[in-house]
């Protein structure tokens, strides 16, 4: 849904790295190298960034009653 600010497992701040990670991967860079360059070393943080799917634009269409 929304970009996670912290890793769900360890609590490290990762929200500031997501958009740079996404942009570099979309340009064709290897995700492993990008995560290494950004300093994301823990596998739990890497998993959180790699598996995140942005659904907020699709969910915003529905109204809350």
UniProtKB/Swiss-Prot annotation:
UniProt entry keywords in alphabetical sequence: Cytoplasm, DNA-directed RNA polymerase, Metal-binding, Nucleotidyltransferase, Transcription, Transferase, Zinc
Positions contributing to Zn(2+) binding: 7, 10, 44-45
Cofactor note: Binds 1 zinc ion.
EC number: 2.7.7.6
Reaction catalysed by this enzyme: RNA(n) + a ribonucleoside 5'-triphosphate = RNA(n+1) + diphosphate
Entries under SUPFAM superfamilies matching the protein: RNA polymerase subunit RPB10
Cofactor field: Zn(2+)
InterPro entries per the UniProt record, alphabetical: RNA_pol_su_RPB10, RNA_pol_suN_Zn-BS, RPABC5/Rpb10
Compartmental location: Cytoplasm
GO molecular function: DNA binding; DNA-directed RNA polymerase activity; zinc ion binding
One GO location term (cellular component): DNA-directed RNA polymerase complex
Top enzyme category: transferase
Superkingdom, natural source: Archaea
Key word Cell membrane present: no
GO biological process: DNA-templated transcription
PANTHER family: DNA-DIRECTED RNA POLYMERASES I, II, AND III SUBUNIT RPABC5, DNA-DIRECTED RNA POLYMERASES I, II, AND III SUBUNIT RPABC5 FAMILY MEMBER
Quaternary structure (record): Part of the RNA polymerase complex.
Family to which this protein belongs: Belongs to the archaeal Rpo10/eukaryotic RPB10 RNA polymerase subunit family.
Its job: DNA-dependent RNA polymerase (RNAP) catalyzes the transcription of DNA into RNA using the four ribonucleoside triphosphates as substrates.
NCBIfam families in UniProt: PRK04016.1
Name assigned to this protein: DNA-directed RNA polymerase subunit Rpo10
Lineage of source species: Archaea, Methanobacteriati, Methanobacteriota, Thermococci, Thermococcales
């Amino acid at each position: 849904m929304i970009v996670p600010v912290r890793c769900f497992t360890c609590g490290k701040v990762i929200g500031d790295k997501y958009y740079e990670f996404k942009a570099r991967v979309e340009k064709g860079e290897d995700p492993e190298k990008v995560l290494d360059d950004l300093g994301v070393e823990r596998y739990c943080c890497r998993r959180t960034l790699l598996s995140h799917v942005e659904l907020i634009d699709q969910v915003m269409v529905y109204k809350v009653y």
